[in-house]
Design a protein with these regions (language model features):
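N-terminal signal peptide c-region/cleavage motif recognized by signal peptidases
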Residues: 17-18
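Short acidic/proline- and small/hydrophobic-mixed sequence motifs that coincide with surface turns
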Residues: 36-40, 92
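Extracellular beta-sheet/turn segments enriched in Thr/Pro/Gly and aliphatic residues
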Residues: 90-114
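Boundary at the C-terminal end of the N-terminal hydrophobic targeting segment
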Residues: 21-25
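Intrinsically disordered, low-complexity Pro/Gly/Ser/Thr-rich segments with frequent PxxP/GP/PP motifs
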Residues: 51-76
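Asparagine-centered strand-capping/turn motif at beta-strand->loop junctions
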Residues: 30-35
């Protein structure tokens, strides 16, 4: 009986450990140093072909000099693509950002060339 209990506990520990390896909680602090108000902020897993919803929300703005923390829960990897759009529709796109290692400061020189 004790051996079965030990086996059940070991299985439960392995199950919990594998679940933790599947999904993680991350965040990234994004600082706006562009000189313009950011009106849209998209963060998507780097494996996605589409941008996820605007994390600033319907009333949200990221004003010049301000920082926005973006919480990212339930993702398998800390690698994300990030796009910001300012009040003039200029875009700033960052590919494959490891949010577990880096925060992001967006500057005028980061503007997309298109």
């Amino acid at each position: 009986m004790f051996a079965k209990l030990k086996l059940a506990v070991a299985a439960a520990v392995l199950l919990c450990a594998s679940a933790a390896a599947v999904a993680g909680d991350y965040y990234v602090d994004i600082t706006n140093k562009t000189g313009y108000t950011i009106t849209y902020l998209y963060v998507s897993p780097e494996t996605s072909n589409y941008w996820e919803e605007d994390v600033l929300g319907q009333e949200g703005l990221l004003r010049p000099g301000k920082t926005q923390r973006v919480n990212l829960s339930g993702y398998k990897t800390p690698i994300f693509d990030i796009r910001l759009v300012n009040e003039n529709d200029d875009r700033y796109t960052f590919w494959k950002v490891n949010v577990s290692e880096h925060n992001l400061t967006v500057k005028p020189d980061d503007r997309d060339d298109d």
